Amino acid sequence: MAQQNFQPALAHVLSHEGGYSNNRADPGGPTNKGVTQRVYDGYRKGKGLAKRSVKSITMDEVGEIYDRQYWDAVKGDLMPDGVDYVVFDGGVNSGPGRSIMWLQQALRPIYTGPIDGVMGVGTLAALKAVNNNDALIDRICDARMNFLRHLGTFPTFGKGWTARVAEVRAIGKAWATGEKPQAANFVDGGQAKALVEDAKAAPSTAPADAATGAGASGLGLSGYLYDLQNQLSPLSYTSEWIGKVVVVVALASAVLAIGGLGYRWFANRRAKRLAEALGTAPA
């Protein structure tokens, strides 16, 4: 999509962003037409103008901010029809770098560089090598949804985000195939900023370490029980009661060990999925 088509793309983005909002659960804070107060303050400062509420932002200011801080940031002029709009919309909602990371993930295995959110020579070269931008858009939107589902704010804004990405997918694919895109609709929650700072924490392996002894001490609960079992075993022949205790201790040790190993597998699997969603997993 060329620069002259920036305005149609912006019109679709603004439909998704809506007007002024100040939802306490939205990490973006006070926002108008997708421009946060923080971004607006930075823009006004750069112009040598006094701060004012983002409620007072003009459409000329909106257009300039989107053009410079989002469209140019993702190098919209250098991307194919449809793909540029999809990356542009993602950049507005989650930051240009994050949206470029989704593009880089979607370009695998053609793209072999780091998932760093930089639209460099390698990313652009891989993009030019793609012969099915329709499918590429699907992969970008899939990566975006995977990221969104790993945010702690998804229960609050997930319905709106899901609706927005579904429309972005359809609009982008229409542009990619030369068809007339559908209108974009505002769905409450879809305008909330989706930021990596709100990502869920990876599950801790501490419970598994405590159970199996894989932590710093090297001796977990199952290890202590195993030692106790060894100490009591010689006495089990002299007392039926001690023999029963040995059996119980042995069973408890086995349950803790198996449970700890199972939880560690679960925690590592969740951590891997989180890393993939956030773009931090090794290539």
Whereabouts are the PLM-identified features?
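Cell-wall polysaccharide-cleaving catalytic domain and substrate-binding groove, primarily
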Residues: 1-254, 259-283
